[in-house]
Regions:
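Alpha-helical scaffold domains
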Residues: 2-187
């Protein structure tokens, strides 16, 4: 797999895809997978491959597990950056998109990649899912902390979301407005 971590583990006693498949909502398999991946990050390719599963539940739970794992271990993002960028650009599944939006600002992006990722996140604002929109708005704000040239466009998007967005988007917009006002530069 392009842009993965380590080699495929020879231990087959745990199947990541099966752990994420077909469980009731209250037992999604994500905590079990997280525990395995934290103990053996070399197996992360198994989790990344689940993003390509034919089962939307597995894709959703894989994205959830990746987002949670890389929040704790951001160093694991670098080897899978290309895969995540491709998945973020190609996925239409809302559950995958909102987790991708949360991960994108944490990727080790080059200055040339930041505008492309910002544009992708901006397109997420047109998603039917309000959760995707909220995560995208937050992600664009987070990207603007890395690239000051995005601060003006982010301020405009945040202000617009406060005026015209769904209630959850307006609430996130208000939170970001307060951060914009408190910020050292006053984004």
């Amino acid at each position: 797999m392009e842009g993965g971590i380590g080699k495929r583990s020879h231990t087959r006693s745990f199947d990541t895809g099966n752990a994420l498949r077909g469980r009731p909502p209250f037992d999604r398999g994500v905590p079990e997978v997280l525990g395995r991946m934290e103990k053996d990050p070399e197996r992360m390719n198994e989790l990344v491959r689940c993003l390509d599963s034919g089962d939307p539940v597995v894709r959703s739970r894989a994205a959830d597990a990746l987002e949670k794992l890389t929040t704790r271990r951001p160093d694991l993002l670098k080897p899978i950056k290309k895969v995540l960028l491709r998945e973020a650009s190609g996925s239409v599944q809302q559950e995958v998109r909102w987790h991708m939006a949360q991960m994108l600002p944490r990727l080790p992006l080059t200055q040339r990649q930041i505008p492309d990722v910002f544009s992708l996140l901006r397109s997420y604002l047109r998603d039917r899912s309000v959760i995707v929109q909220v995560c995208a708005l937050q992600a664009m704000f987070d990207l603007s902390l890395k690239d000051p040239s995005l601060r003006g466009p982010v301020r405009e998007l945040v202000e617009a979301s406060c005026r015209t967005g769904a209630p959850a988007l307006r609430a996130r917009g208000r939170k970001l407005i307060s951060l914009l006002k408190e910020g050292p530069d006053g984004l």
